[in-house]
Amino acid sequence: MPAHVTLSDGTVVTPGVMPDTIPNVGHTVADQLAAMNIQHGIPQMNGWQNITDGSCDAAAHYQCISGYKPRQVPNLTSLAQKFAISDMTFSMADSPSWGGHLYAVMGSLDGFTGDNPNRAKGVPPGRGWGCDSNRVTPWVGPGGHTQLVPSCVPDYSLGLANGGAFRPTPAAYHATIFDELHSAGLSWRIYGATAPMPQFFGGGYDWSICPSLAECLDTSQHNNLVDSSQFFTAANSGKLPAFSIVTAGGSHNAVRESCHNQYSMTACDNYIGKLVSAVEQGPDWSSSAIFITFDDFGGFYDQVPPGLNPDKTQRGPRSPLIVVSPYAKARYTDTTATTFAGILAYTEQNFGLAPLGPNDKGAYPFTDAFNYSQTPLKPVRMVHRALPASAKRIRITPAMENDPS
């Protein structure tokens, strides 16, 4: 974080320190484009005061231009100081959570802008954000025309109407890393929320990835979406699959521990520590690589202009990323630019899988962050802190229920 930030209107802002309750800053596609302020194809990274809902303007005290001190996130700090970090991992697109979860497993947005889905007019609401939601989201066709279509990656081979979407859609089928793993006989799981719950983000079901893919939701693949509590059981018993994704949510209310805006950073840091400890203390530690990251940048300031993906689409702002493994280089900062597609590329190269498309084929796979010849690093002790009073007062408000992120 620089000492001072100059915005496009000439305002100079001194970055602040965030409270434990993460500020509520807009981060829709429109917000991200406003913040990046792309001029002649080059992001200027100085339009943060123009985030569309006013959540980072002068009246909001430029709250998005702020960060956390190491003492506020002791587990993340310990992991970053012991293992490897990437300071050049960009979002694959200027999209919030729904798009971030798509490209995490496809290396593509399949024509979607990535904006979080909204209710379709005249249709009863369904479950979550995906194929069973009866929701719509913007999709850009080959000619550049944007239209609202079901928030579902269809699979027309299933024999279902509309490929599994609730109404006809121009979106095409796109393979996922799950398909590759299955074809290779490799196990995988998504640890998250298996059904909607009466909580923010459906108790995490909105983030569970599988429901947005007809091929996952409507086939036996959906059996690989299990409650997040099962991650701890698998880690403790040495039965983790070859590939795991942990999303915030599930029966133990991990949505409140998600690091999402309006929730407690202490709760999130505690939860990350609990997840990492389960692996570190389990039988699978010696063969594990953990990538800790966030599905988007949350609306918070970043000064580094993102470039383009291999398929020439625009990247979005950076997301923090920590690599935790016995074979991660100790106290190493990986400065090679990449995206979530780099995690796909790492997985594919590790297991000898073919790339899904140009973005993971051309992505940097965190090669320099690992040294498989080194003496394996030992686990780092994680801590659990009491929640501050502000975290105990957090309640679901109408504003949170209607938050498009």
Question: Language-model segments: which ranges?
Answer:
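N-terminal pro-sequences and low-complexity stem/linker regions of secreted or lumenal proteins
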Residues: 1-405
